[in-house]
Amino acid sequence: SCRKLQNKNNSLREEIQSCLLRDILLQRADGTLCSLEKLVSGKRSILAFLEIGAEPTEHVLNEVLALEKSAKGNSKGIGCQLLFVLRQEKDLQHKTLQEVLALDAGSEIEILYDISGGASDANAAPRTAIGDTASGTLCGWQETAKRMRLAEKLPVLAAVRPNGTGIYGTCGYHVGSVELMVRILKEAVRTEAD
């Protein structure tokens, strides 16, 4: 259920896919539960499942920080909402993440926790919204990686249209991946308007 949308006239358009993402359950920092569908409804989004403390995530956060600094003064920030999905509450204290959150460059940034079920890594016990052991279900980052045809390697990032369709994804870290996602989301809006 993932198809690549191609247009030979524009290489950026060649990167755009159309993957229906599963509606996973996430928990906001204030403890309320929210579906991915509701979070992205009407908004271009970058969904980022982060592994705080790991080198690839540090690169992603530094890239977001640089983009946010360059967008400072623009009322819409980088032009899309950033949904940072953390593994645990203590991850919120991470220095670079705190720098991104403190910058307040106009982008809408939301901190979330994945409670959709499944294990956050191979050694962790699966958990659900009520803290019980899940029965073999994938957690949100694994499900998103699978739907976007990515390796199961954190961080997992997905550019998501306002209708909940994933249009570009990456895992691990690739230089410029966040900036590319911002550009792809802007191009997708232009493509829809054509």
What are these regions (language model features)?
Residues 39-41, 77, 104-105, 149-152:
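Extracellular/periplasmic catalytic domains that process cell-envelope and extracellular macromolecules
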Residues 2-37, 58-63:
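N-terminal "domain-start" segment that seeds a small globular fold
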Residues 56-126, 138-145:
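Structural microenvironment flanking redox-active thiols in thiol-disulfide oxidoreductases
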